[in-house]
Amino acid sequence: MNFNYHFIWSLVILSQISQVQAGFGDPREALAEIQQKHGKPCDCAGGYVSSPPINSLTTVSCSTHTAYSVTNSLKWQCVSTPTTPSNTHIGSCPGECNTISYDSVHASCYNHYQQCNIGNKTYLTATITGDRTPAIGDGNVPTVLGTSHNLITAGCPNGKKGQVVCWNSRPSVHISDGGGPQDKARDIIVNKKFEELHRSLFPELSYHPLALPEARGKEKIDAHTLDLLATVHSLLNASQPSLAEDCWLCLQSGDPVPLALPYNDTLCSNFACLSNHSCPLTPPFLVQPFNFTDSNCLYAHYQNNSFDIDVGLASFTNCSSYYNVSTASKPSNSLCAPNSSVFVCGNNKAYTYLPTNWTGSCVLATLLPDIDIIPGSEPVPIPAIDHFLGKAKRAIQLIPLFVGLGITTAVSTGAAGLGVSITQYTKLSHQLISDVQAISSTIQDLQDQVDSLAEVVLQNRRGLDLLTAEQGGICLALQEKCCFYANKSGIVRDKIKNLQDDLERRRRQLIDNPFWTSFHGFLPYVMPLLGPLLCLLLVLSFGPIIFNKLMTFIKHQIESIQAKPIQVHYHRLEQEDSGGSYLTLT
């Protein structure tokens, strides 16, 4: 009998056991979640701070600001680069600068700077407000003066906080000032030299007056941008079909800043794939290095002449090994990046070609467009009557493209997994390299349309959020992004047009309604106040009645309690032999 009871209870207990998985799950999925939460460097998910964080893992230059990956939160915090007052040149330098001047000062050491002169030489001057120790590279980092002088990032002058100092306006070779005026001057110098090189290799064409290329209208989208979006959607459809069949692809307005991912070293062992044959020559452009840890770097020594092109040092990664182009067994050290890749050098600048006289250190990278994804299930703020009523907008959840394509998982598996994934994105990276300038102008045209239509909206006092091209409809403007709708068949070019038609139909219904257009058009402005006014009116009207009813009920309950008589209960006590009868009161 006991055996039967034990058997029955064992079955009951086993039926209540549920399957669980021990451990912390797939670390690659965790990495993808972390990177989606913290975002891309230039998105500044950690916000803007006045001074650089004390402890950071890496630094990425974003033109107008510098992003720092903070160790305690891993979110990217940004610091705006110093600005120049309206009067940028103050004439002679302060007296303190006549005794000592510095080669370079980091941009985080001051808030504003100006130009001044000492003799016939131009310097930069500012009041030091911060403290920063110069960044020293590893012992094998190639520099101008050898491995014993391996300074790669400038610092603040020691003991000069609160004092005025001066430093050279011309950038120091291979030394970065953290995105300050010297780094900007270096970019200008390099861009000019590449423009001269481009003109010498590709002379400008003179068009016949009757054969000028047709100007692209502002209501049309550039074919390069459409091809890029189509390629992105094709890859997304191959990796996550459920997401690709109903989503929005959002491009950042303004100049594009693509993501730079580590290039698969197995495809270019010891940089044997580099060559000096003809390759597309594009101007240097800014990228966002992503997931760079230990990299194989290549460098060329400084020749100490005026013909050298200083591309800077790749300070965003730790170079585990170096390939010296200067001593390579080649007739020259000019290099072409392998197909679908670029050289990423100092200041996060990307190059498709490095001429013979280049100097600095670079890494190979594959590009990925800076595109965010909005799932179709995510409600986007298409204007409706609730926008006229002042309904608060909901934040849009954006998914970075590298998360949607599963690139973070591939990167975390190492070189082999990355190689398999990056090979699939070769076409996309090559297309992005070729069309980065055209895409920039296209999105800028769209941004101009957004700004122009925004002025019209404000002038007409219409609370429209759908800011698109006036003819045909191009994209949906969301959070300074230009979003294109896509389904399983590809990019839907008439999606915005349909939304516009629906919006116009609803707007006409409101306009034709005499209730909405009464009071000389002031009703749309009064409607957001009607809710609070109605609530206040209800409180003032029914509040006293409810209060009186409540007080009456409480008073009645108190009176009923007081009116109850005190009931006295008697019972006979137990009698003992020697006692008599007693009564007790309870």
UniProtKB/Swiss-Prot annotation:
| Motif YXXL motif location, chain numbering | 570-573
Positions on the Extracellular side per record topology: 23-526
Q: Where is this motif: CX6CC?
A: 475-483
Residues listed as glycosylation sites in the UniProt record: 120, 237, 264, 276, 291, 304, 318, 324, 339, 357, 487
Q: Which cysteines are joined by disulfide bonds?
A: 247-250, 247-483, 475-482
- Topology feature Cytoplasmic, residues: 548-586
Describe its assembly: The mature envelope protein (Env) consists of a trimer of SU-TM heterodimers attached by a labile interchain disulfide bond.
* Official protein name in the record: Envelope glycoprotein
Q: Which organism is it from?
A: Mason-Pfizer monkey virus
Q: What is the lineage of its organism?
A: Viruses, Riboviria, Pararnavirae, Artverviricota, Revtraviricetes
Q: Which gene encodes it?
A: env
